[in-house]
Amino acid sequence: MSEIKQQDNQVFEAITKEFERQDHHIELIASENFVSKAVMEAQGSVLTNKYAEGYPHRRYYGGCEFVDIVEDLARDRIKELFGAEHVNVQPHSGSQANMAVYRVALKPGDTVLGMNLSHGGHLTHGSSVNFSGVDYNFVAYGVDKETEKIDYDVVRELAREHKPALIIAGASAYSRIIDFEEFKAIADEVGAKLMVDMAHIAGLVAAGLHPNPVPHADFVTTTTHKTLRGPRGGMIICKEEYAKAIDKMIFPGIQGGPLMHVIAAKAVAFGEALTADFKAYQQQVVLNAKTLADALTEKGLRIVSGGTDNHVMSIDVTSFNITGKVAERALDDVGITTNKNTIPFDKESPFVTSGIRIGTPAVTTRGFNEEDMKEIASIIADVLAHPEDENVKHDAKVRVRAITEKYPLYK
């Protein structure tokens, strides 16, 4: 980064400090990960200079013959990974991917069935403060109060009652396997289209560790970071019958020129996802998550739904007589990064919460193993039991640094 330091020392210092934070902290935010050096190099390449409105071999600008190669590679690799009929890799984010699907599949005011945000859904699945909840009539399904798992019978009853035009499966804080085949059966019964937002689990699906929604859904959206371990961005997979409509909705519908440097980074990440190493990585992600959940349970913390089948879990911190807000701050003080998160049937506000959400993609990328998960669980329990005790927090900082120093970032 010598050029940045010479040109703009303020930005250089901020980047340097952020690198130190990432290197010295244990990153447990479930939606974060560490991309490879190759992905970063692609995103910082000369492709950032190129405008390429349109699609490969159908551009509105000249000089696109090489960026066409990159976008074709990205699309072909996704087709191979997921068995997709059609792919659009141009969405700048998962939210824009979702917006494009809504505008293709729905008319303003149409009814949509999606997962309640407070039960593990996503902002773009009908939150009243999001465009989705403003433009469409969302009806929410949630989890069963006892099992804290999706009750497909209730989903079916809601679908029969409200006759949605679109049903959305997928979540941002749901730790169990989602039955896409059952969602498809429900959608077919009521004449709805099915969209799956697999942003959190795309890497697990690619590795064969979670059922693939592509054969069942009309549309599948995802981010390209998180478990897929690519650059920040979005993507849409759809049936061939919707291909032209989806492409037209992305460009010129809601976006202009694609970010070709990001698409290059996506292509590199998708290539990595096709390797045996990537599958082994995802297996370790799941193993680490299960180990961490079990160890936290042994320490007296309650995991929502009783455990995890994937990379993520929500922890109910009320048994320690604290809020999610307090837990997030106390853990951050010692170098463990999490996020406060509502849990099903939460009595606290989204700004306070009764839980925190944690995940294992980032720490697994660094090389953390099951023994590290047990130590992390012990640190978390100690800190949450004594969130204001400076002696406990000092000891926790030392233990955190001992772990992170074993796995230096980008070294």
Swiss-Prot record:
Tagged with keyword Plastid: no
Listed under catalytic activity are: (6R)-5,10-methylene-5,6,7,8-tetrahydrofolate + glycine + H2O = (6S)-5,6,7,8-tetrahydrofolate + L-serine
* Record key words, sorted: Amino-acid biosynthesis, Cytoplasm, One-carbon metabolism, Pyridoxal phosphate, Transferase
Q: Which GO terms describe its biological process?
A: glycine biosynthetic process from serine; tetrahydrofolate interconversion
Q: Which GO terms describe its molecular function?
A: glycine hydroxymethyltransferase activity; pyridoxal phosphate binding
Q: Where in the cell is it found?
A: Cytoplasm
EC code(s) of this entry: 2.1.2.1
Spell out the NCBIfam families in the cross-references: PRK00011.1
Name the family the entry cites. Belongs to the SHMT family.
**Protein name (database record):** Serine hydroxymethyltransferase
Tell me the name of the encoding gene.
Answer: glyA
